Swiss-Prot record:
Swiss-Prot/TrEMBL TPR repeat ranges: 46-79, 80-113, 148-184, 224-257, 374-407, 409-441, 485-522, 672-705
Protein name: N-alpha-acetyltransferase 15, NatA auxiliary subunit
Positions of post-translational Phosphoserine modification: 302, 537, 588, 855-856
Keywords, ordered alphabetically: Acetylation, Cytoplasm, Nucleus, Phosphoprotein, Repeat, TPR repeat
Species: Pongo abelii
Top-level taxon: Eukaryota
Biased composition (Basic residues): 595-604
Amino acid sequence: MPAVSLPPKENALFKRILRCYEHKQYRNGLKFCKQILSNPKFAEHGETLAMKGLTLNCLGKKEEAYELVRRGLRNDLKSHVCWHVYGLLQRSDKKYDEAIKCYRNALKWDKDNLQILRDLSLLQIQMRDLEGYRETRYQLLQLRPAQRASWIGYAIAYHLLEDYEMAAKILEEFRKTQQTSPDKVDYEYSELLLYQNQVLREAGLYREALEHLCTYEKQICDKLAVEETKGELLLQLCRLEDAADVYRGLQERNPENWAYYKGLEKALKPANMLERLKIYEEAWTKYPRGLVPRRLPLNFLSGEKFKECLDKFLRMNFSKGCPPVFNTLRSLYKDKEKVAIIEELVVGYETSLKSCRLFNPNDDGKEEPPTTLLWVQYYLAQHYDKIGQPSIALEYINTAIESTPTLIELFLVKAKIYKHAGNIKEAARWMDEAQALDTADRFINSKCAKYMLKANLIKEAEEMCSKFTREGTSAVENLNEMQCMWFQTECAQAYKAMNKFGEALKKCYEIERHFIEITDDQFDFHTYCMRKITLRSYVDLLKLEDVLRQHPFYFKAARIAIEIYLKLHDNPLTDENKEHEADTANMSDKELKKLRNKQRRAQKKAQIEEEKKNAEKEKQQRNQKKKKDDDDEEIGGPKEELIPEKLAKVETPLEEAIKFLTPLKNLVKNKIETHLFAFEIYFRKEKFLLMLQSVKRAFAIDSSHPWLHECMIRLFNTAVCESKDLSDTVRTVLKQEMHRLFGATNPKNFNETFLKRNSDSLPHRLSAAKMVYYLDPSSQKRAIELATTLDESLTNRNLQTCMEVLETLYDGSLGDCKEAAEIYRANCHKLFPYALAFMPPGYEEDMKITVNGDSSAEAEELANEI
C-alpha cells in the first residue's frame, strides 16, 4: 500500500505523538493517535499505527502493540519510522538480533538518520557485534564530527577489537581538539587522559605511556591511579630505582596495601631471604603500628626467624584484641611446620597468661589485661577447629564463653566448630544464640539465616531474614527483588536436600533471571558512560559482562539445577497418591492411624500457611495496583510465573539441564565439574562423541580425578558393549580416541591400575570400588571392603568423604549392603562423634531450632503426638 502523507494539521499532531513518547506521556500520546486515526482518510496511516503500538507496548499491552505495529508496517513498508518502531518493540522483548534487522531495514530508507544509527550502535555493542559497531560509529563520526561521543565511540570500537594503536591515534586526535588550560583541573578530561594511557599500556607501548603520564600528570585528578600506573610502567621498563621510589611513596600513603610491598620487592630484587626481610624491617621502623609489613614476611620465612617474627605479630594482635587474626594467618596452615610453631607459641601464651598475666614468664613489663587471655583462647578454638580437633576447640571456646558470655564473636566461632564437625543443627542453634545478643546486626542475621538453611530450616531462615526486609511484602519476595543470591543458592540446596525439586529449581531459575537482568542492565551504560567519560570503568564493565556467568553464584545454581534434572531423568516424579497407596499397603492399623493423624496435621498446617500466603499475596497485589494507579505510566508486562510443580514435572529434563550447562562450557572451562556434568548428560542421551569430548577435556584438567575415572570406565564399557549399533565414522573415531586414553587394556584392568596408583586416597578408593561393582556385581564384597577402609594412613579421610562413602552404601551403588553400611556408620561415629550423619539410628535431636527460642509450634505438634 503506498504511503499516505499527512496534511499540516495531522502532521503537527504526529509530531506531538513523538514528543509524548519521548517524555513518557503515553496516555496523551494515545489521544493524539486517536485524533489522527479517527479520520477515515488516515485510519490506516502506517506511521501513526506504529507509534500507537509502541505507546501501548509501554503500557504493557504487548499483543495489541505488535498487531498495530505490524499493520502499520504492512501499510508503509518504505517508512523508516515503521521499521524503527518495530525494532524498538523487538528490543523491548530482548530480541536484539531481530531488532538489528529492523534497524538495518530502516536505514535503507533513511541511511543518515542519527537516532536509528545510535540505537543500532547500542544493540551492536550489547550483542558484541564489534565489527558492525565500528562501522556504525564511523558513520556517526562522519555525520557528527563535532560531538565528542562520536570520537570516543569510534575509539572504543577499535579498543574492543584489540586494535590498540588505532584507538590511541583516534583518542590523541580527539584530545587535540579539547581546549583546556594546563593548570585547570577537569574531571572528564582527566578520565579521558587515563583511558588514553590505559590503551597505550594495553598496546604494549610502555615508554609512550610513561611519557604521556608524566606530560599530563598535573591535569589528572586521580593522583593515586597516576602513581600506581607509574610504578607498574617503571617496572615494565626495568627502571627499578625509580620504581622503588614510587612504591615507597605509595607505602607512605597507605602502609596496609599488600600490592605496594610486592611492587617494592620486584623493584629491589632481593637476592636472598634476609635481603627480602630487610625490606619489611625498614617498614617496621617507619610504620610501627602497621600490620601488613609484619604479616607478609611470614609467607616466606621459616624456622627460628619465622617463630621470632610470628611472636611479635601475635603479641601485637592479642594485646590490641584483634578478632580477625586467625583469618589473617589462615593461608599459613598449608605448611605443617608453621602450624606446629603457631600452636607451640599460642598454647605457651595461654599457659603463661593464666599463671602470671604475661606472654612469657621471663618477660619484663606490665601485665596484660584479662581480655588478652580471652583473645588467645578465641584463637586456639579456631586453630584446633582448623586442624580437625573439634573436642579441644569446643573446650577453649566454652572457657572463653564462660568468662565473657556477651561477646558475639565467641558464639560465632562455636557455631562454626559444630558446622565443621558435621552437626549443622547444633551450629544453627548457636548462631541463633549469637543473633539474639544483637538483633540489629545484619551480618549476624544473615549468617544465622545461612546456617538455618544449611540445616534445612527454611521457614525459620525466612523469619530470620524478615527482620531486615521491607514491610508489606514477604521476606522471600523482597530478597528476590534485591537479587540476594547467597540466600537463593542456599535455599535451592536445602530444597534439593529435602527432595523438593520444584522449589529448588524455582530458586535456580530466579538466579538465572538475575544474571539476565544484570546483562540487560548494561544497556543504560552504553550512552551514560560516553556522556560522562567514565571510559575505564565502562570498558571494565563490558569485559565483566562477557564473563558474568563465571560467577560462583551462577555456577552453584547451575550445578544444583543440573543435578536435579539428572535425578528427574533417572527417577521421574510419579503421582503422589499412588506412592501413598503403595506406602500404606503393608502398614498395621496403629501405624496407619498414626500416619493419618500426621497427614491431617500436615494438611491443616499447610492450609493455614496457604491462607496466610494468599492474604499476603492479596495485600501485595492491592499495593501494586495502588502504585500502578498512582503512577501515570506503567512500563512493561509481568514476568512469567515460576510454578514449582511445573518445573519438577518437565518432559525433557536433559534438555533443560543443557540450558544451564552451556554457559558453564563457554565460561567455566577450567573447572573439571563442568565437563563431568556434560558427560553425565550426554551419557544419558547416548551421544558418544560428546561423551568422549567431555572426558578428554576433563582429562586435560586432572587426569586422576575420582569422578572422571568413573566416567571413563562407563564410557569404555558402554562403547565396547554398544559400538555395533554406531555408524562406521563414529565407531572409527571412538576406537582411535579410546586407544589413546586407555591403551591396549580392558575396563577391569584399567580400574585395577587406577586403584594401585591411588590406593592411599579414600576418594579414589571409593570411585574404584563403585567401578568394581559396576563391572562385576559378583565382586560386591571386595568393593565394600575397598570403600569402607578407614586406615589412618589414607589421605582425604575427612568428614565429607566418609559421608559420601556412607551415602554410596545406602544408595545402591554397591548393591544392597545395609549391614555393611551400619558397621561403617558406627566406625565413622567413633572418628566423627559430633557428625549427625553418623549418629545411631534411634538418635533424635531433642532440640528444635527456631527464631530466638520460640518453639511454640513444636510444643503444639508434640502435644498432638502425645
